């Protein structure tokens, strides 16, 4: 459960992302594909080279979903229900991949905002991304 302080930290961190959200989403995906090559199996029809239009487009989808989640921290299941259905029933993404992408997103945020990435902010973002991952995998059961 996210505390009021966690929610404030997440909102402040995401506000600093600003107009770079789609780029950070794409960068996090690129990090995920490079660090965990098995994640590429879900994108056989994509050009997965760094900077590809398809990776950028999917990075924007990731960023848009996270922006929606940041704005709906009090109702993540409601905000992410359709996305959970999609990943569980149609795409059948292995739930571990959400944790891998979350880790790469944390690395991306830390790389771009090192001064703002305090231990408290890191912990809050980690809890938030874990909550998002839990919601996205909730329809698997």
UniProtKB/Swiss-Prot annotation:
The lineage of its organism: Eukaryota, Metazoa, Chordata, Craniata, Vertebrata. The keyword Lipoprotein does not apply. Involved in oxygen transport from the lung to the various peripheral tissues. The modification Phosphoserine is found at residues 3, 35, 49, 102, 124, 131, 138. This is Hemoglobin subunit alpha. It comes from the Eukaryota. GO terms for cellular component: blood microparticle; haptoglobin-hemoglobin complex; hemoglobin complex. It comes from Suncus murinus (Asian house shrew). Heme b binds at residue 87. One of its GO terms (molecular function) is peroxidase activity. One of its GO terms (biological process) is hydrogen peroxide catabolic process. O2 binds at residue 58.
